[in-house]
Amino acid sequence: MALKQSYYDLWFVSFRLLSTSGHRDAIHLKLKRNQNLPPEIAEECKVRSQDPFSLLTECNRDYFTNYPVSTEFLLTARLTDREGGTMFFYSSYRWQAIDVVKRIALPLFQR
């Protein structure tokens, strides 16, 4: 049975997967570091020995396709899982982001 956790407003960042095996898209969202996690999420991740900042996010696919990598999204989401599966964050595909911050990728070398 899926986790029964509350929804929270959390920051996520888009990134490119190193391996797309088993995934529909190469771009995904993960929890942005350096934010305070609700105790409910922190405790569940600790119990399952999971790094909350490495979990993927199920949400509106527009965030993968219509924004550049490294864009940050403030979403209403919750921690959940599927029976026998790994945990992930869920935000309904019908919901809009509360805030979006586009990041410009800088070149590796500057003159």
Question: Model-derived features: where do they sit?
Answer:
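Short, structured beta-strand/loop micro-motifs enriched in basic residues and often containing a Trp
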Residues: 49-59
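A generic structural signal for short beta-strands and their flanking turns/coil linkers
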Residues: 25, 53, 71-73
